[in-house]
Amino acid sequence: MSRESVILVHGLWMNGVELSVLGQHLRRDHGFAVRTFSYPTLHGNAAEICGELAKFGASVADAGRVHFVGHSLGGVLVHRTLSECGREFNGNAVVLGTPLNGSKAASGAARWPMLRPLLGPHVRNELAVAK
């Protein structure tokens, strides 16, 4: 069995269940130990969540090499976490459907007071920075 792990990080409005098929595939067909990092997408702040993701990754890294797979907002959080403390991890990162340069849709929606609560602070602060 591989001493390599994959941490799956879900996107906005998700909880990690949507990545379970990918996790099963990585476990069954490639021998990875798969863990899911779940976080609140509509409250809290990205800096705290990235800190928690770094701690989670460090706890998994004790067992060997760690890779990250982030979907959408999860990819933004993976990117930020690895940018700030990536030297601690010796694996790879894959982001799926991740708006690393911001999102014009999120930026537009953030301008509407009725839609702001649906976006949460992570989207308003991380994704709505459309470039």
Regions found by a protein language model. Give the residues of each.
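Proline/glycine-enriched tight loop/beta-turn segments at coil->beta junctions
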Residues: M1-S5
